[in-house]
Amino acid sequence: MPTAATETMVHLSDVVVMEVSNPVFKQKHATRNTLARNRMLARLTEATEQGALLATHDNAELMWLRRHVGTDDIAEPEPYLFCFQHDWDALTSAERALRTIKGLVEFHPDWAFWGYDAALLWGLEVPNDLLGPRFLVKTGCSVPLSAGCRLLRPRTASALEQVDGVWVTPFWRTVEDCLLRAPFSYGLAIADSALRAKGVSHDDFCERLCIDCEGRRGYRRARVIASYADGLSENGGESRFRAFFIAYGFPVPELQVEFRDPLDPNQVFRVDYFWRLEDGPCVIGELDGKGKYTLQDGGDRESVDPFVAERQRESHLTMLGHKVLRFTFDELKNPGKLAEKMRLAGIPQRADLAEEWRRQWYGR
């Protein structure tokens, strides 16, 4: 019969054995953690390269990712969708929306998108303020209404097309859906980019809109947007400033007018806006200092400091005898001050033009 002392020794012996095996267990556990971490970081990298958020159907992976959100540079910007935090921080609002959509499609391959989401996938200019709740087509799939999704019942399911692996409404249906609901300046950005992307004429665009949308809610305003659309506008910012000129009674400028550099005949400057004024010098308008140039001989421009290049470019344009008026995007937040700036530059503001636009837009 063992004594109490013997029982204690056996117990202590067991503890010693456990202490010996513990480092081995810890090493194996650390190895498994390292392998899991490397695997998940590799998957995040792959998703980033594909322009999507990582969506996982594996519960163990989901638990690992959520444990490491806020560490290891991992973020969960949308439920069940993950990415690197530094990468997400560097994205524009449009890029974030696109990656979110592509991540959602990993979970729901039967989902289809319309409106502003579809416009993004088609490569159209969609202002950030229009990005928010997802625009989903009702195709019999399960849709989380609690997420604030906006549903559309398409006329025919066969009308859907795929863009980058995502089901969307056709190009022109997408444009029309956007114009039927968008504010004027935002809708003009979308309409301009549609004309630019497809190279169709302004008249053909207006005719298509009339055939497809007459009688639909929002058609009158969509028609107003289409009437001012111009495919020469190169980005959404240029379109929104042009919308301001229209709504506030300023003459609509010519777009993307080219001028030869008076000091270098091989270089041609292309300006955003150009007003030919009856009284006084003409005015060149430039947005955000993003000057554009082309070399006639097809050569490469030597790399120079962008600020210095812009100042030189502006001085050369002034040599042509034109005023140069620069706009910054924040100026749209203070339309009264922006209008005063344009008047001081010699661009006439006409009350009758502003009133004409108001009658068109508001119907009175």
Feature-to-residue mapping (PLM):
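Short gly/ser-rich loop at a beta-strand->alpha-helix junction or flexible surface loop bordering the NTP-binding
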Residues: 1-218, 349-364
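Surface segments flanking catalytic/ligand-binding clefts of nucleic-acid enzymes
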Residues: 11-46, 51-52, 56-60, 195-364
